[in-house]
Amino acid sequence: MSSNIHANHLSLDASSSSSSSSSSSSSSSSSSSSVHEPKMDALIIPVTMEVPCDSRGQRMWWAFLASSMVTFFGGLFIILLWRTLKYLWTVCCHCGGKTKEAQKINNGASQADGTLKPVDEKEEVVAAEVGWMTSVKDWAGVMISAQTLTGRVLVVLVFALSIGALVIYFIDSSNPIESCQNFYKDFTLQIDMAFNVFFLLYFGLRFIAANDKLWFWLEVNSVVDFFTVPPVFVSVYLNRSWLGLRFLRALRLIQFSEILQFLNILKTSNSIKLVNLLSIFISTWLTAAGFIHLVENSGDPWENFQNNQALTYWECVYLLMVTMSTVGYGDVYAKTTLGRLFMVFFILGGLAMFASYVPEIIELIGNRKKYGGSYSAVSGRKHIVVCGHITLESVSNFLKDFLHKDRDDVNVEIVFLHNISPNLELEALFKRHFTQVEFYQGSVLNPHDLARVKIESADACLILANKYCADPDAEDASNIMRVISIKNYHPKIRIITQMLQYHNKAHLLNIPSWNWKEGDDAICLAELKLGFIAQSCLAQGLSTMLANLFSMRSFIKIEEDTWQKYYLEGVSNEMYTEYLSSAFVGLSFPTVCELCFVKLKLLMIAIEYKSANRESRILINPGNHLKIQEGTLGFFIASDAKEVKRAFFYCKACHDDITDPKRIKKCGCKRLEDEQPSTLSPKKKQRNGGMRNSPSSSPKLMRHDPLLIPGNDQIDNMDSNVKKYDSTGMFHWCAPKEIEKVILTRSEAAMTVLSGHVVVCIFGDVSSALIGLRNLVMPLRASNFHYHELKHIVFVGSIEYLKREWETLHNFPKVSILPGTPLSRADLRAVNINLCDMCVILSANQNNIDDTSLQDKECILASLNIKSMQFDDSIGVLQANSQGFTPPGMDRSSPDNSPVHGMLRQPSITTGVNIPIITELVNDTNVQFLDQDDDDDPDTELYLTQPFACGTAFAVSVLDSLMSATYFNDNILTLIRTLVTGGATPELEALIAEENALRGGYSTPQTLANRDRCRVAQLALLDGPFADLGDGGCYGDLFCKALKTYNMLCFGIYRLRDAHLSTPSQCTKRYVITNPPYEFELVPTDLIFCLMQFDHNAGQSRASLSHSSHSSQSSSKKSSSVHSIPSTANRQNRPKSRESRDKQKYVQEERL
């Protein structure tokens, strides 16, 4: 075949034109510039003896083109003719039908039944024919439809064969435009013939299935078939090949996107759009190049095909690209008139397409997810998935705590999943931690993205919340949906999620696979934030101490003898867990606690106790009745995890005579090697098997105190109308009250002398988001306080807002409301803010302002307003007229062994600076505005500022550390919640989820037993049994004495800020010192944080070992009752004394 072709690069069109002249005209040359131009006596059409081809070189391109044109226009004519005849037939039948119908109506009565049968038979035949045609049409539609497997296979096959036909065209484009070919010997022609037979059959199916034949005939795919299929059959008939319009097969590339969608390869809108643009651009490019290749190699017909030029197909592709891009180098250009005319129009359309399509294609390619792909798990290394609110602030805070150097076992890779790509700052943060952090773009609501991050093999999934969002309920709903999606994909995954609102935690209980016993946790920021603030009402500064305990802080050493030195030494302490050595088995908790503190330099505050049925409970300072079991888990306060190992390695035989705790390391005793707990990591808790700890702090084996037995005098003396508890026995409870009964007017509040109470100043209106005041009230109404020890709570704020909160507060006793504003000094004076134990400033309008620096403006203004107020000497007036103000423990009838015996009365407060205040802040940097006399830099971290160190400011951001702490040890969260919520349990949460309110219960032995749990207290050293240690004594001696004598566990000091100065100072501010060392020197003005046991005898006498919440200048306690009531030596005479009061005060007292 190749031998019959005279020259591969010769232009056939120019040569055929030359062959019509005489053979002797060899001197005349073609207009072609080809250097391989043949002599004019050569035959242009290759001739072989086997193929009957026209030896005269006659061109037959018109035959190929005519076959296509006849097919197209002939079919178009038939379709139009059919439609015309059908229309005329329909019109005629319509008119004839009316005539026949009229005749049928007129002659219907005279016609016999038999005359109608031929008509019925004809209608049945027509119906049968219509049914057959419809069936064939439906069958053809199914065959070409991509909705069935057969249709999809057929569609894909047609596309693949079209690409194959295009490839054959590329191969044949290197041959002359028209040449003689033997069908039986040309392999490419045979393949092309087979392809086109298949295309013809597929065309028939499409034609049958088409509803509108005319539009089908004019479709792009149909036009492609018209100009590519008939010429192949003409080639076989004429033994001649014409390259012609076969380049139109490139238009099939437009369907490439549809084919990929049929194969389920393209799923996203961006990928579909990208493939669409690319396929349209490439198909147009290749088709136009094919046309230029045809006309340039053929020449113009009116020029007798003499102005042709030899261009390969790929040179034409190059020409079209430089033309579309408007570059036009000029090395290749069109010479024929047809080619130039085509280029004129193509430049207009091609330039528009190039200018619009190419930038969009580049943008789609450039915007492809940089953080796509999938996570590849590393053998021997766990990974966690972090999702939710992913920002620079939230991620940096999380990583700073999670990857803290004090954690010695962080072999965990952190995988962040978020649907928005990180900004440059966040991307830089990820790069700085690239060895332990990876980021993937996606959504946890998409199962495909969950599979990408290997959620099924993840150790846990942590969901962060946006604490500063405008709609907390919507944010909680988003996180709940994330939990549902993750649990639906993998029910066994452990999830730790942040929640903003307490009432939204109930929705998590509706998720079937949510199981807190298996490690699932919901960290409710509102619950913990208000719980911390409530504990500061009982012991000022406690919120700061607890916040520092579960936050990882590095030790900052200060040489100067300043208050920051002692504060930062305590800040470096954190909460850890470790299994106790078998050397402690059988010893009581106080004995082990003293041994750990004195010898191991560790402070143990709680243990995990397993009852006979293997149920685990966390017991905080359980007392001397409980003995340590084998494999007991202890909760320690220490500076790092390595120190806590001493409790596990301690051996009495090997370490009894060691004085340096750093030398206590693992010894070679066989007893330690065989110890079962040694196989457990201190960070792996009950998730390795067994039941997770219940947050209850009361053990099942309760001490058998006769005061807890029903029928005892204690129960008989209980006033059933006052001393009631909820159904769990964890909180004081009363019958629901209408809000009108607890509302005080300003005059009523002023006439009712309040003292030792808690004033809650709240900013909120009818449209503000609820902050959940129940979480503030519940710790103040814990049942481990006796009723007379409960501090009265007075809310000052908008009545519209408080009405929305009242449904959750109406079951708590001693709650009053003063409608007004915390910025009104008259309202503040009416509630005797100078006599309160604590003033709490909250805001429900924090997140509705775009400027973060203005989010706390109301709280800051209220705080400064109170501090600038001046008061008279109200204390002296009260003491002169009423003995009822005597605080608990100050009564001279108190037993001599009371640790608070002989304390001084509260000094008079004449300035608002001395009022104990705790202010909630949203923006940490706003803490600089609370104290005007401090020197805090605006860039100083919150925990280093004076207001936070003094316990007068609290921000929700400090709770971010709980995510990391809970992951490494979920018992830490249980311990924190037990301390700050007053005893909230999952059972209580389930009950609140059902009724949204506490349910009253009878005082049964089981519920009364729940009262026997320790509580946080604050003791003064100025007087009492510890007074001898207050002046220069050691903290370690105080620790041991309190533990042995009263089972009280000391864990910190609340010291005056200027106590270290040699000269007296008028400053009344105090700061927190956490877990001071044994030899730490005490001063008389110190207040000691301690965990105090429940006093069963305090309910019958005002003299009790009770807590106190001191003001910044106070070293004594206040009563938490209405102090206009005269008291007697016996508490039981109080109702009688009330009857002797005037009627107005009695009514006001009943309202309270």
Swiss-Prot record:
Homotetramer; which constitutes the calcium-activated potassium channel. Interacts with beta subunits KCNMB1, KCNMB2, KCNMB3 and KCNMB4. Interacts with gamma subunits LRRC26, LRRC38, LRRC52 and LRRC55. Beta and gamma subunits are accessory, and modulate its activity. Interacts with RAB11B. It is a multi-pass membrane protein. InterPro entries: Ion_trans_dom (IPR005821), K_chnl_BK_asu (IPR003929), K_chnl_Slo-like (IPR047871), NAD(P)-bd_dom_sf (IPR036291), RCK_N (IPR003148), Slowpoke-like_C (IPR048735). Residues 530-550 are annotated as: Segment S7. Ethanol and carbon monoxide-bound heme increase channel activation. Heme inhibits channel activation. The protein was initially thought to contain two functionally distinct parts: The core channel (from the N-terminus to the S9 segment) that mediates the channel activity, and the cytoplasmic tail (from the S9 segment to the C-terminus) that mediates the calcium sensing. The situation is however more complex, since the core channel contains binding sites for Ca(2+) and Mg(2+). Residues 1136-1152 have a biased composition (Basic and acidic residues). This is Calcium-activated potassium channel subunit alpha-1. Residues 753-773 are annotated as: Segment S9. Phosphorylated. Phosphorylation by kinases such as PKA and/or PKG. In smooth muscles, phosphorylation affects its activity. Palmitoylation by ZDHHC22 and ZDHHC23 within the intracellular linker between the S0 and S1 transmembrane domains regulates localization to the plasma membrane. Depalmitoylated by LYPLA1 and LYPLAL1, leading to retard exit from the trans-Golgi network. One of its GO terms (cellular component) is postsynaptic membrane. Residues 651-655 are annotated as: Heme-binding motif. Potassium channel activated by both membrane depolarization or increase in cytosolic Ca(2+) that mediates export of K(+). It is also activated by the concentration of cytosolic Mg(2+). Its activation dampens the excitatory events that elevate the cytosolic Ca(2+) concentration and/or depolarize the cell membrane. It therefore contributes to repolarization of the membrane potential. The S0 segment is essential for the modulation by the accessory beta subunits KCNMB1, KCNMB2, KCNMB3 and KCNMB4. The S4 segment, which is characterized by a series of positively charged amino acids at every third position, is part of the voltage-sensor. It catalyses: K(+)(in) = K(+)(out). Ca(2+) binds at residues 928, 931, 934, 936.
